[in-house]
A protein has these predicted regions:
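Amphipathic, Lys/Arg-enriched alpha-helical "gate/interface" segment within cytosolic domains
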Residues: 1-118
Length: 118
């Protein structure tokens, strides 16, 4: 487990998944760090599912969204990942952003939006 004031990153062995739980707004290096560390775990353990808990999420800075799509997504696509799950309430103020990300992801992954992690 990797824990900061911005997020917690966990390897859920029983689900063969990485769980990234956002706690508060961050940008730049603090935003990018869990994706880099998660990518290492994906490679090491052949992880098939990435779960983002956006319950306490935030609207990304545009530069971070560009970085995510240009730098990390190609590496995720080349990895063992098959599924991406977003934990988010139906009435979340960030739903539009998550739906935008989903639109970019469905070409390469199974994508699910759930209100709680089971």
């Amino acid at each position: 487990m990797y824990n900061t004031k911005y997020y917690t990153l966990q390897h859920l062995k029983e689900k063969n998944a990485i769980l990234c739980t956002w706690k508060q707004f961050c940008k730049g290096e603090e935003y990018q760090e869990p994706f880099r560390y998660g990518l290492e775990l994906i490679k090491k353990h052949n992880i098939t599912t990435w779960i983002t808990d956006a319950t306490h999420g935030f609207e990304n800075e545009e530069a971070d969204t560009v970085w995510l799509l240009e730098e990390i997504m190609p590496k995720f696509i080349e990895s063992s990942l098959e599924k991406i799950v977003f934990v988010i309430a139906d009435d979340s103020p960030f739903m539009d952003e998550i739906l935008g990300q989903k639109g970019a992801l469905v070409e390469h992954f199974e994508v699910a939006l759930v209100e709680e992690l089971s």
